[in-house]
Amino acid sequence: MTPRPAVSAHRGGSERAGPATWEAYEDAIASGAEYVEFDIRRTGDGVLVVYHDPRVGPAGPPLARVTHAELCDRAGYAVPVVDDVMALIAGKLVAHLDLKEIGYEREVIDRAVALLGADGLVVTTLEDCSVAAVTRGFPEVRTALSLGRDRRELALARLPGTRLSELFPARRIRACGAHGVAVHQRLARTNVLREATRRGLFTMVWTVNDDSLMRSFLTHPRVDVLVTDRPRRAVALRGPITRPRH
């Protein structure tokens, strides 16, 4: 029987609430997803928050220069605190922690393990050094190296080398000690999934919202977790999990 991957609600999902809001994370619990993803950054007053972008708006100040209260005011909603979201989902969903910055790995994972247990989370990040910090400090916690960095974050001269290292990431994975890969859907259509499973790594594919692509990845034998903004739809398309993946 074909195994079916788990579903991760990206930013809590956005089918019934704004993404990365408290309401989205409450809704994720009822969505049928097994995982829920949240991005982690730190504000200027040291609060670890669930927020994707490095700035408050396209031309706004960096998060590192505003307090949590200022961030909420500028964003126009109560930006969730990481500890609160972890407490909300504890025992209900696996936390998919996407680390957006370096330097706070131990603090975040200490809290996560205390609230969720080591088997209640998976850590993803684009930064090899963050993966290495987590795998060294918390070998019992699953980590996945994210592949598919936004080209807008890269100088033109770095783009070819970065893409090559994502298409053939074995050296990076060995160096940082990742247990898996979190692959952008475009890269997932290359050889990356095949190589990952050949090496015994678990795999996540992000962020898949189109019905036809979801169907394709939900029946893909090399996909362990599908990350989507539409967790209810993904669960409906998938049907029940037929065999535990990891």
Where would I find each of the regions flagged by the language model?
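Phosphate-group recognition and catalysis centered on beta-loop-alpha active-site segments
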Residues: M1-H246
